[in-house]
């Protein structure tokens, strides 16, 4: 396992952001490494997942999960190794999936840990395609979207960890998949690597016209995780009985007020009514936690058979977590964002 560090670095929430997070909202602290008590394990973080939902946990507005306290460690999924164990089910060296957050070390009771096996080939993938983002894509599309062969599926943030997986599952189910991404490079990746039929740059001046042309038969499923102007362009293209799984609204996470322009709610509600549209939000852990094994079995097989392609963007060093997270919210990432906190020896 290598020599144990003598101090634990941790990023805490220094202040709540007003609008987009800034470096001053975070503070790096150091303290002594805790000693595990009876029935506990000491974990060393190897990989830390950075995800858009963390922005919501920085605010104190009512939500589906409690906010991070001022001075509290920033939340986050992690892949760790057991350093010391007073728990019968865990031994030093074990690989585990957990929620240690933005820090080098953590004490766990073991209740929220999942073993990853003795020698996982790609342990960080448990934070992406084989973890929460992949699970979100899988359940949102298959349970709420219910794709049928020949239908048109539109996926925003097409090269992100959720969108990329949604589109590829859609192709496996026989859909025409239209991706939406920011920039030509991401669009090329969506079509040439991920297998999307079309991918459109939402920065284009004529984006709405391009989308209408790409969906001549309308839109049967719109997988929503961004919101904003993209939804405005999709709305008039929705077919009768269209389905809209909603797993996130990244475009509004930093908003401090409603966007300018006319009230869009009457048009949305009229469209939902007249076209009998299913518009459903979901929180993956709370709504589908009981189906995790179903996902792991099928997604694991797809990945093994190279039917699902996956891209990571790994940044080395816990010290880089805040700036990398800020970039994630600005759409600078290309694939799943992971911080490599320590080596895997």
Language-model features and meaning:
Residues 229-308, 341-345:
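Glycine-rich phosphate-binding loop and adjacent beta-alpha segment
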Residues 206-216:
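Short amphipathic alpha-helix with an adjacent loop that forms part of the alpha/beta core around
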Residues 2-6, 286-345:
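C-terminal hydrophobic helical "lid"/dimerization subdomain
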Residues 32-50, 58-102:
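Glycine-rich beta-strand-centered segment in the early N-terminal region that forms part
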Residues 95, 152, 176, 242-243, ...:
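Short glycine-centered segments of the SAM/dcSAM-binding site in methyltransferase folds
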Residues 74-81, 92-157:
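NAD(P)H dinucleotide-binding glycine-rich loop of Rossmann-like/cofactor-binding domains
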Residues 127-205:
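Mid-domain Rossmann-like dinucleotide-binding core that forms the NAD(H)/NADP(H) cofactor-binding site
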Residues 97, 154, 200, 222-223:
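N-terminal Rossmann-like NAD(P) cofactor-binding module of classical short-chain dehydrogenase/reductase
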């Amino acid at each position: 396992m290598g020599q144990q560090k003598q101090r634990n670095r941790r990023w805490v929430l220094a202040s709540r952001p007003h609008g987009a997070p800034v470096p001053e909202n975070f503070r790096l602290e150091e303290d002594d490494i805790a000693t595990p008590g009876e029935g506990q394990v000491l974990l060393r973080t190897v990989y830390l997942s950075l995800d858009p939902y963390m922005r919501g946990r920085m605010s104190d507005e009512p939500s589906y999960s409690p906010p991070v306290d001022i001075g509290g460690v920033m939340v986050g999924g992690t892949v760790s190794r057991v350093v010391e164990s007073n728990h019968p089910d865990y031994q030093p060296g074990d690989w585990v999936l957990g929620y240690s957050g933005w820090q080098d070390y953590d004490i766990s009771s073991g209740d929220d840990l999942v073993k990853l096996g003795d020698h996982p080939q790609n342990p960080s993938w448990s934070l992406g395609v084989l973890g929460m983002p992949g699970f979100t894509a899988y359940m949102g599309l298959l349970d709420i979207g219910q794709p049928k062969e020949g239908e048109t599926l539109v996926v925003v943030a097409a090269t992100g960890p959720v969108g990329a997986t949604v589109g590829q599952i859609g192709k496996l189910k026989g859909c025409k998949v239209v991706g939406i991404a920011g920039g030509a490079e991401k669009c090329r990746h969506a079509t040439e690597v991920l297998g999307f039929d079309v991918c459109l740059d939402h920065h284009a001046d004529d984006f709405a016209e391009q989308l209408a042309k790409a969906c001549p038969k309308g839109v049967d499923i719109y997988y929503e995780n961004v919101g904003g102007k993209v939804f405005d362009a999709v709305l008039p293209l929705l077919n009768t009985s269209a389905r809209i799984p909603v797993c996130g609204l990244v475009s509004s996470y930093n908003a401090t007020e409603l966007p300018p322009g006319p009230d869009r709610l009457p048009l949305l509600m009229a469209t939902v009514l007249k076209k009998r549209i299913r518009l459903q939000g979901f929180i993956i852990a709370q709504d589908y936690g009981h189906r995790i094994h179903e996902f792991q079995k099928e997604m694991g097989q797809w990945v093994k058979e190279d039917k699902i392609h996956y891209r990571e963007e790994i940044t080395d060093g816990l010290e880089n977590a805040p700036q990398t997270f800020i970039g994630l919210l600005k759409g600078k990432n290309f694939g799943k964002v992971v911080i490599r906190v320590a080596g895997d020896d």
